[in-house]
Amino acid sequence: MSILAGVSQCAMLHRGGEAEIYKVVSQGREYALKWYAAGVRFDAASIEAISQVHDRGVYRVRETGEKAGRPYLVYDFVDGIPAAELGALPVAFAISLVRDVVRALAALASCGVHHGDLNPSNVIVCADGTPVVIDCGIVGPGAPAYAAPERFQGRAPDEKSDLYSVGMLLYRLVAGVDLVVGDTFESYARAASLVDEIDTTSLLYGRGVKAEELSCLEPLWKGLLRADPEDRVEDFDELDELLEIAFGKVSGGSVAWETLRAGTVAALAEKIGTIGHGSEGACALPVEFAMIKPTGGRKRVAFACILGLILLLVALFFAFSRGGPSIDETGASILQKSRSLDAIVGEAQDSSGGDSGVSGTLLESLPTPELEGAGDNGVTDE
C-alpha cells in the first residue's frame, strides 16, 4: 500500500519552479514528498538502484510515481537545512562538508549510479553538521549553474561530470554565491565551456578568504573546474586525497577544528531542526494524492456484515451436525424410493376427484434431516 494512503499530517516545506516539497507523517513516520514540475523525468534504473543504497549520506527512496503528469518521490524525511541556505562557511567546515558529500557520491557510484544534479539545494545539512545527498537520477543536465559542459551537450551523467559539480558546490560553500551565472540555458552552457578562464582564487580573495586558505584550495580548482573531463581528477578516491590534504592545512589541528565545528553548527541550530515542525506550513495533502479511506460508519457496517456471516455459518454447522440422517443418506433414500414411483402413479387417486398423485404414505416414509428445535415451532399436524 502507498505510504501516502496513511498520511495523518502534511506541511509545505518549499514551492518553486522545479518542485513542491511536503513533509508528511504516515503511520507515525516522517517522510518527504517531492512533487516535480511537468517535464521532469527520472531514470528508472537509477531510482531502483538508489533504493538499495544504505549509506547515511544518501537519502532513502521509499516510493515513486506520477500524478497529473508530474513525477514524485517519497523518501525518508531528512531533518536539516539545504546547503543553499547556509551562506558562506569557514573554509575548513566547507571542505569537511564536501568530503562527506564525496563519500556519499562514491557509495552511489559503487552501485552504478551517478547523481547528475548535484547542487546546494540537493545537499541537506543535518543538526550534527553532516550532509545527506538527495534527488539523484533526474534525466537532463540539472541545475545549470552546477552542470558540467558535457552535460549541456546531452551526455549522460558520470563520475567526471559529478566531479565538476563538486567543484562548483565547494566554491558556493566558501564564497556564498554561485561561480557562474546566466539567464538562459545557452548563457550557462557558454559560461561552463569557459570555466578554465575564470580566476577563482582572485574572486575568493575579493570575498575575504585568507591567502593561506586560497593556496590550499588552488589544487582543488585545478582538479575539478575544468571544461574537458580528461583534465579533471581521475575519480572520487583521488579527490578525497586532495580534500584530506587541504583540510589538514586549514583546520589548524584537532582542538581548533572541534572549536570551529561546534561554533559553526551552533550558528546553524536556529534553522536546523525547525523545518516542518509545529503548525507553521500545515496544509492538506494535494488532492491528486488523496486516497479513499474507510470512514467510521463504513467500518461499522463491514464489521456487522462479517459478524453476521460468522453467526450464520455457526448456526448451519449446529443444524446439520445433529443425530438425524445426513444429507447424503436422505438423497440415497429418495433415489431408492423414486424407483417405485412409476408403479404407484395412476393407482393412487385423490379422494376428491381422481387426480393422479403420489401416496402420502410413501412421502412420509422418506427420511429428513433433523433441525434443531424441530417440533417446538408451534406447528401441529391436523
Regions found by a protein language model. Give the residues of each.
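ATP-binding glycine-rich loop module of kinase domains
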Residues: 20-42
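Protein kinase catalytic-loop region centered on the HRD/HxD motif
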Residues: 103-113
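Activation-segment/catalytic-loop signature of the eukaryotic protein kinase fold
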Residues: 64
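Regulatory extensions appended to serine/threonine kinase catalytic cores
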Residues: 251-297, 308
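Conserved short submotifs of the Hanks-type protein kinase catalytic core
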Residues: 68-81
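Conserved catalytic-loop aspartate of Hanks-type protein kinases
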Residues: 162
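Activation segment signature within eukaryotic-like protein kinase domains
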Residues: 97-98
